[in-house]
UniProtKB/Swiss-Prot annotation:
Keywords: Protein biosynthesis, Transferase. Belongs to the Fmt family. One of its GO terms (cellular component) is cytosol. Attaches a formyl group to the free amino group of methionyl-tRNA(fMet). The formyl group appears to play a dual role in the initiator identity of N-formylmethionyl-tRNA by promoting its recognition by IF2 and preventing the misappropriation of this tRNA by the elongation apparatus. This is Methionyl-tRNA formyltransferase. (6S)-5,6,7,8-tetrahydrofolate binds at S110, L111, L112, P113. GO terms for molecular function: methionyl-tRNA formyltransferase activity. The keyword Ribosomal protein does not apply. It comes from Streptococcus pneumoniae serotype 19F (strain G54).
Length: 311
């Protein structure tokens, strides 16, 4: 039985962990995840999905604020683990820890070398990629730069957003890891170096990148909106107030960018630099998320054709 330390944080990681727990070839000696955080306006302390899964399985849990140089790292190195599996952990692993293991692999939610970094699923959508995927890779000190052990792709559809793609790729990652790990541990797979000429980066999204620029095409804005749904959520401004857009569809239309072209009971169409967007799910300032019909029947009932979204 191979003894593992698992490191991860969000739902994506929890799915991978649960997969490992179903395979009797592995023993999870410890789980490392990010510390509990205060979430929302009420600052409710929330455990990570990986911590919740680990508690349900009765596993030992470590939550260092920073792994490097921590007492927790020293404890982990004394457990006698054969290797480390990480999946969206959110911290760099110190070389000292990596060097103490027989192997260390990462489940990364992109088709490397494209989309290295912390937001690969977001950027796959924002940049209009036709496919997404998962790469199992060896861990090295440089971010997502290790040799690739295996890859698996799936198509991106127009119905996908960050939430749906996370769910799909979590299952892909779980299955690919379980399919790959035995042969890798046995030495039957020769990892492939990444083509550095094809590397792209997908860092965590900055607040200023959430703002919609109506001078882009309808397709570009469509991709940005779904590439931030359900988090961090794209926004614009309406009458000076922040206005979040969770879902919109590209449609035909022509007008000044940001201009309202059409309003009816269940449709609000806004011009872009090329074509238009039909807004489907929105959140006005100080209100909950709602469908467009609810918005137009409520706080949006005073809107008129010709008014504009934007600064």
């Amino acid at each position: 039985m191979t003894k593992l330390i698992f490191m991860g944080t969000p739902d994506f990681s929890a799915t991978v962990l649960k997969g490992l727990l179903t395979d009797d070839r592995y023993e999870i000696l410890a789980v490392v995840t990010q510390p509990d955080r205060a979430v929302g306006r009420k600052k409710v302390i929330q455990e990570t999905p990986v911590k919740q899964a680990a508690k349900e399985a009765g596993l030992s849990i470590y939550q260092p604020e920073k792994l490097s140089g921590s007492p927790e790292m020293e404890e982990l190195m004394k457990l006698g683990a054969d290797g480390i599996v990480t999946a969206a952990f959110g911290q760099f692993l110190p070389s000292k820890l990596l060097d103490s293991m027989d192997f260390a692999v990462n489940v990364h939610a992109s088709l490397l070398p494209r989309h290295r970094g912390g937001a690969p699923i977001h950027y796959a959508l924002i940049q209009g990629d036709e496919e997404a995927g998962v790469t199992i890779m060896e861990m090295v000190k440089e971010m997502d730069a290790g040799d690739m052990i295996s890859r698996r792709s799936i198509p991106i559809t127009d119905e996908d957003n960050v939430g749906t793609l996370f769910e799909k790729l979590a299952l892909v990652g779980r299955d690919l890891l379980l399919d790959t790990l035995p042969a890798y541990i046995a030495g039957d797979i020769k990892p492939e170096p990444q083509d550095t000429s094809q590397v792209t980066f997908s860092p965590n999204i900055k607040p200023e990148e959430e703002k919609l620029d109506w001078n882009k095409t309808n397709r570009q804005l469509f991709n940005q909106i779904r590439g931030m749904n359900p988090w961090p959520v794209a926004h614009t401004f309406l009458k000076g107030d922040r206005f979040k857009i969770y879902e919109a569809l590209p449609v035909e239309g022509q007008g000044n960018p940001g201009e309202i072209l059409s309003i009816c009971k269940k449709e609000l169409i806004v011009a872009t630099a090329e074509g238009a967007l039909s807004l489907k799910q929105v959140q006005p300032a100080g209100k909950p998320k709602m469908d467009i019909a609810s918005f137009l029947n409520g706080v949006g009932r005073t809107l008129t054709v010709g008014e504009r979204f934007g600064d």
